[in-house]
Amino acid sequence: MKRTSGCSRPIRRPATLAVGFAALAVLAACSSGGSSSPGGGATANSATANGGGAVPGQTVPTANLPVLQKVGKGEGQLNLIAWEGYLDPKWVKPFEQQTGCQVNAKYAGSSDEMVSLMKNGGGGQYDMVSSSGDADLRILYAGDAHPVNIKLIPSWKDFFPAFQSPAFNTINGVHYGVSLQWGPNVLMYNTKDFKTAPSSWDVIYDSKYKGQVTVPDNPIQIADAAVYLKKHKPSLGITDPYELTQPQFQAAVSLLASQKPLIEKYWSLASQEIFDFKNGNAILGAGWPYQVSTLKAANFPIGTTIPAEGATGWADTWMLAAKAPHPNCSYLWMQYISTPKVQAQQAVTYGETPDNKLACAEMDKLQAGSCAEYHANAPQSYFDAISLWKTPLATCDDGKNNCVPYAQWVSAWNTQVK
């Protein structure tokens, strides 16, 4: 597998986000999606409602493109835009051997970078992207994704219903990819410095830890501040951390601006946060289960928790580029990555939750107790605590046009927070 790192690229690109913003500014409320269980009886309301969906008065430009009717021989190459850790040799190498499709990885440090790389349908260079809910609508309504024939993905029928045709990758019955995994953005801490898990996100705003905190270099971090303020400043009236009025938005931005002196690094790649913990530069951080799993594998004293305020999270999709140069290899990848064994491998390695309900047993074969550890059979209360990423739009869920759109999130992050 060949890979291209995004380590040297700054993630400050408001100019690249212009594609689709004219439409996104007037997008209406997201659809509610399904209510079927992803785990032990949970409904995953946020997994469906918070992802996006069909928007009145708007159409996906590529909706009528013909889909593949039969998967042919692979073209020999597959160019993937992915989150770091999503293309581990443990499952990529067997895929390459089975299909003859060599995987070429381009790691992105943020959803904004993924949107930029997918511009013009992937530019005839990229085949697929492992997009999250805060990128999906931008990619779809910019016309950069291609419809997918889900009938060609045999394991799709074994997905939890909430992730078969979710609002974040399926518009008016048309699929633009296949659901992958989902999980929370967690509070990480060095267990030598914290003998018990912090019960609140307070710690990452506490001046006591000046210069010892890491957080993602991502405008969607404003939603994390909103989750915190929803609990600690109820007078703001925040109900959805991605649907903020101007006063709510400014309160979240001000909180993050006051946090700046505490920050050791705004990380753009998971490996940067791992490095800072390993080298003692950070003792607290907002991160992904992947960082936690990697640090634990290195016997580093890392702990993780979802504090009382709750957390944000993601639900990812392997989305097909509108101008994918290797469609057969792309479908072969979707078939492969959706199987219980491979979903289990990624879940255990990355520390996230699979969408294939048969993966739970495979997870426990790989690592005893991992199905429960990574919440594949968690109770409803666990899912209720997580607000999954979605694209902030000007039109709020109640139909009022007084929410702050994502373009302003990007501007505030780059000019007021950092």
Give a label for each model feature.
Residues S254-Q259, A298-A322:
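Periplasmic-binding protein-like
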